[in-house]
Amino acid sequence: MRIGFFTDTYTPQINGVVTSICLFKQALIERGHEVYVFAPTPEHADDDERTVRFHSLPFVFQPEMRLASPFSMEALRVLDAVDLDIVHSHDPFAIGLFGLNVARRHKIPYVHTYHTLYPEYVHYVWETRLTQKLAERLSREFCEQCSSIIAPSTKVERYLRSWGVTVPIDIIATGVDTERYSTVNPTRMAALAEKAGLKPKERALLFMGRLGKEKNVELLLRAVWHSHLPNIRLLVGGDGPHRVYLESLAAELGISDRVSFMGYLQGEDAVAAYHLADAFAFASTTETQGLVIGEAMAAGLPVISVEDHAVEDFVINGRTGLVTPGRAEDLAAAFDELLGDEPRRAAFAMAAQSRAASFSIERQAERLEHHYEHAIATHRPRRIFPRLALPGRRT
């Protein structure tokens, strides 16, 4: 198949959506498909001739994000030369909507992965109940224009149905490169331990992700403060707009000597961070799938998390990790319980790594391939937003 990925979020950005796109792109290529990516154009050189960049500007509220032009002559030139079989969008914004029009003009299926629960992120613009309801309505109206939706978790599928989405939804989580996370470079691991100030007898918890308000890292800091373990350390791998606040909070709580902010970690450094830790700590309730949880489990880490539907697809409470109510005291008790019992922690670690195999990128890419095949076989052209239509043939 010739597949077009249309996304407003792509490299060099670092987030779960980009990780998902890159993993599926490579896995689909390895399965013999051609994958074209249409994405914003920050200062970044691509080594792939099948990546087409749209002009873009930094988003005023989050400079690392991009606002793309809704039109590209270069994209049209490529699309004229390439007969796509299917359009797969990863954002409902400028480039995603461009892809919607491409699908309409070429009368091919338009599949969309609903990566982000947008009503949970309106605080970056203007947080009110009205804006949340508006985000729900716009999400529903957009999804209703699609041939089908891919939900990365049962949580997302439930939300979409509750908002009134009626098109077919298939639950396909982003796969994990289990082979990559199962082995580690000892030299890189030792260097990262030194950078983090991790002492030999310390018990390390790891959080990996963007440091935004919605990730709830504040709760992890407060849980460390409540912990009774004298040798506990929280490793924070990531960066973002909330970092300065979190560093000041750690100082205010008097735990700066037990928290290591390591910035964004990529490649072997990210793998090394997972292998440095004894458990993975997670407190976000806005995730659509918690991709980092799968990565942690693939590296052999048990997970300690607050209750959330996105977590339940990965973590089996009492077997691959501990799931607690969303209070700092409860998280702290779970930290102490698991990190204070090494035989139990080791058993959880083995079970976690075994379970991660069921979420391998190879298995998930096969499921995505089947989704595409079904979408193509059953496709009937759908009417899209008239105001978004580009000049072209009518459906």
Please place each PLM-identified region on the residue numbering.
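N-terminal subdomain of nucleotide-sugar transferases
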Residues: 1-55, 366, 373, 384, ...
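Short hydrophobic beta-strand element within catalytic cores of glycosyltransferases
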Residues: 302-305
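Aromatic "clamp/platform" in nucleotide-sugar-dependent glycosyltransferases that forms part
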Residues: 285
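Conserved donor-binding/catalytic core segment of Leloir-type glycosyltransferases
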Residues: 193, 198-224
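Short alpha-helical donor nucleotide-sugar binding micro-motif in glycosyltransferases
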Residues: 79, 143, 264-265, 272-277
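Short acidic/histidine- and often glycine-rich active-site loop of Leloir-type glycosyltransferases
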Residues: 121, 171, 308-318, 322-323
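A short helix/loop element that forms part of the nucleotide-sugar donor recognition site in Leloir-type
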Residues: 182-198
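Conserved acidic donor-binding segment of nucleotide-sugar-dependent glycosyltransferases
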Residues: 317-318, 322-328, 337-343
